[in-house]
Amino acid sequence: MSFELSNIEYNDEKSWNLICEGKTKGVFQLESNLGRAWAKKVKPKNIEELSDLVAIIRPGCLKAIVDGKSMTQHYVDRKHGVSEVLYLHDSLEPILKKTQGVLVYQEQSMKIAQVLAGFDLQEADDLRKAIGKKKADLMAVIKKRFIKGAKKQGIVSKAVAEEIFGWIEKSSRYAFNKSHSISYAICAYWSAYCKAHHPVEFYCKYIQFSGGKPDPQQEVRELVTDAKSNDIYINPPSLKKLNLTTEIIDNSIHFGLLEVKQIGDKQINRLKERLPESEESIGKPISEWSWYEFLIGFSSKVYATLITALVSVGALSGKGVSRSKMLYEFDTWQKLTDKEREWSLGVYKDHDNLLDLLKTIQPTKKQGGGTHNAKIENPCYSLDDDPEWVIREEENYLGVPITYSRVESCDTSLANTTCKDVINGRDGNVKMAVTINAVRKIQTKKGDDMAFLSVEDNTGALDNITIFKDQWQEYKNILYQNNNVLIIGKKENKKKDGIIVDKVLEI
């Protein structure tokens, strides 16, 4: 896949829809829960509005409370006609109209000072520096200059000038540099475009670079879940592919062998050294080996920790044998004596499974042997792959479950809706079997506790699960991270992917 970013059109509907729907995991500046939530509220449709979004979701703007709500919320309400845009003076409208009357950028303060107080570019830049660096002493000096200049210009009264400058002073807590914000917005749009039009490449690259995140494991988990909601499934490492890092192979994303815990360069180097000889001996490439051929013809030539890790993450899947059975037979094979294993290498091609091979090298129980035969014929536990065990092993070795989602280890028969169904617009009552990723408890204005949940299943994730006070009091003991629950509720009309909870059952 190759294209020039400079050739991207900035009116691409698919890209803007992705942003407006909050599907911005991995999108520059907007990938957090906060960014996704406000992207859905702001619904930007051009670079200017996207720049505004980048600026108003910064902590200062979110914490700047005027008339009971943040400046961020004021922007959203005014943009969508919920509240009226009012200006302290008519002269401010040309400067603030594009940002819904909210003083979003430092450059707007500079322009106000130029228009109302006659500041030249240097004086306006001094104001910008005072705002950006929050220099109270410099701001006090500039305020005197501003009031004096405003009087000379005669556009506003002294009282209005003081009120406007007071507003500028308050904006120093949140006003952002517009040139920075525009450049961030362009990068955000580029990444949204890539995600909208080249999703496989997008997810592959972001997984590759997840190591630079504060919590790489959590980053990969979120990317894998987000990819599922777009019908893109990340595959476990595979000995058929032999890729070392995450790569796109046959238009599918595959984790690399080196991304498995307990597998390092030393183990991989030995695998590569011993592989050609074994492929020649077995008579076919590793991609065509059966599990039996791999076990007898190759497993003794590499580290046991490598085999255990590869089997546990599914790197040998597709050979018609469960992972549990592979590990069980590998353990049995390791317990044979060196002489027994050496003899087996000479005759194993006469058989097609470990049990038949063992019968040729060990006598029956009546003959004083058969211990390993009995172990293979009558295992002490089921060798089927239990989803809960697979999830646990993949989380242990990869940091994220790939084959199953965590909730698939539970009884989900009562569920009638998936996360993806909700994302795609399903209405009405819902029953969802999900894993809780996060719980955010808040207090209402009346002092009551309520909460918002982030959840996921095998189809994707949702961040807008609302638990009001009564439900919180009743179910809070089972509402915790990583718990699997059945959520019974209804679609929230105001939010495309919001759910209001009526009941919660632990599953």
Question: Which residues fall in each region the model found?
Answer:
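Noncatalytic, beta-rich nucleic-acid-contacting surfaces in large DNA/RNA-processing enzymes
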Residues: 1-507
